[in-house]
Amino acid sequence: MITKDEVEHVGWLARIEIGAAEAEDYAVKLSSVLDYFGQLDEVDTEGVEPTYHVADIMNVFREDVVKPSLDQKDVLANTAEEKDGYIKAPRII
């Protein structure tokens, strides 16, 4: 059972202002959700293989293929600003 104080504490941690009435309401609702999840403890999972991923696909990567790229002049022709053969981007900090 989640208490009103625990809800208020979590609200404080998340910097969310929760009123007393709301905290009481959330405590009841969250407790019912946790009770619902508690039903999973009663399910017989004997002999059931654990599921680590929904799909059995593991690290599907494509082969790296070396292809010709654009010429530096063509790339720099498409940029607003360039300096010393490089694309000049705006300062962020």
From Swiss-Prot:
The keyword Disulfide bond does not apply. It holds the Pfam family GatC. Keywords: ATP-binding, Ligase, Nucleotide-binding, Protein biosynthesis. Its EC number is 6.3.5.-. This is Aspartyl/glutamyl-tRNA(Asn/Gln) amidotransferase subunit C. It comes from Methanococcoides burtonii (strain DSM 6242 / NBRC 107633 / OCM 468 / ACE-M). GO terms for biological process: glutaminyl-tRNAGln biosynthesis via transamidation; regulation of translational fidelity; translation. The gene is gatC. It catalyses: L-glutamyl-tRNA(Gln) + L-glutamine + ATP + H2O = L-glutaminyl-tRNA(Gln) + L-glutamate + ADP + phosphate + H(+); L-aspartyl-tRNA(Asn) + L-glutamine + ATP + H2O = L-asparaginyl-tRNA(Asn) + L-glutamate + ADP + phosphate + 2 H(+). Allows the formation of correctly charged Asn-tRNA(Asn) or Gln-tRNA(Gln) through the transamidation of misacylated Asp-tRNA(Asn) or Glu-tRNA(Gln) in organisms which lack either or both of asparaginyl-tRNA or glutaminyl-tRNA synthetases. The reaction takes place in the presence of glutamine and ATP through an activated phospho-Asp-tRNA(Asn) or phospho-Glu-tRNA(Gln).
